[in-house]
Amino acid sequence: METELMRIGVSLPDTLLSKFDEIIEKRGYSSRSEGIRDAIRSYISYYEWMGDIKGHRVGTVAVIYDHTKRGLSNALADIQHHYSHLIKSSVHIHLDHDNCFEVVVLDGDGEEIKELAEAIMSLKGVKFSKLTTVASNEKI
């Protein structure tokens, strides 16, 4: 159980904070702090799940990014070329003038898939990224 609370400061774009405030109100949180604690717990849980990605996997990485960010499109292409042995397909959609949505379909070693996803997630200009995988040998 968490006992000691630490005060931190966070800088956010106003549109992101407005959306977060809407969610807090709809979910009935008593404060932004409670919403942030819940979001951090969810992030930690997802990160721990990513640590368990082992063996042969199939999955996707979904990414929304600002293609006007200098060097980002090239960095994404470099990552995809480096991990081309894992990539089976990709779909690229222009959302608006600045933003693109890309889904990359993957098949291969789970640890390498995780490396690819983390390389994409760490790039400046990536606004959203989500890795989803399943063990390819599971009986469905």
UniProtKB/Swiss-Prot annotation:
Positions contributing to Ni(2+) binding: H81, H92, H94, C100
Cofactor info, note text: Binds 1 nickel ion per subunit.
GO BP, sorted A to Z: response to nickel cation
Protein origin, superkingdom: Archaea
Keywords: DNA-binding, Metal-binding, Nickel, Transcription, Transcription regulation
Annotated InterPro entries: Acetolactate_synth/TF_NikR_C, ACT-like_dom_sf, Arc_rbn_hlx_hlx, CopG, CopG/NikR_regulator, Ni_resp_reg_NikR, Ribbon_hlx_hlx, TF_NikR_Ni-bd_C
HAMAP family assigned to the protein according to its UniProt record, in alphabetical order: NikR
Family of this protein: Belongs to the transcriptional regulatory CopG/NikR family.
Described function: Transcriptional regulator.
Family matches, as PANTHER family: NICKEL-RESPONSIVE REGULATOR
Protein name (Swiss-Prot/TrEMBL): Putative nickel-responsive regulator 2
Phylogenetic classification of the source organism: Archaea, Methanobacteriati, Methanobacteriota, Stenosarchaea group, Methanomicrobia
